[in-house]
Amino acid sequence: INPNKWGRGITHIWIASHSGILKRNNHKVEFFDSSFYQDWSVNEIKFQTDNKMYKKTNYDDFIKFNRNNIFKDLQNKINKFKPDFIFWSAISSHIHGEGEYVNIQNGYDLLKNLELKNSLLITAGLQATSATQIIFGKMSKIDYLIRGESELVLLEILNNFDREKNIEDKKKSIEKVKGISFMKKNNFFQN
């Protein structure tokens, strides 16, 4: 999931790097981009232009906002794909950087009230690296946080998961991966 709320068309490098390495290693990947949902996104260009921060342009002529309900669309995507994992990174499209600290929350807000079946939630980014216990305290449905660079760690998680047969063995194999944090029986673990 790209949990972007700014409604601007900057492509995140993590999307290509994460999906590329997973696909190259025979994992199925689906993508959900929240950037241009009218009921979710903030039109940051319009906001900044109205407040005289940006010069008026015709940027909006090139943007088409999705008028569907973002939560219904995401739920439909999850129901159709039936993912073992749902991953989002907290890296922002916002040039000034403050979006990185809210994107982890944005991703969680998109998912927390959906029916996720057996999907495990994984996120990464600055907050996952620097405030792991705080994240688990505020976002209890997250299963795993990846600290630091996440492409290879995410790949190892998926590879370990696929090697095992039953869900308990799958989870045990994930818990051995270096660079993750997780909660188990109300105890915090960090590898």
What do the predicted segments below correspond to?
Residues 3-7, 45-47, 56, 177, ...:
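N-terminal [4Fe-4S]-dependent radical SAM core
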Residues 2-3, 57-60, 119:
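N-terminal start-of-chain detector that recognizes signal peptides
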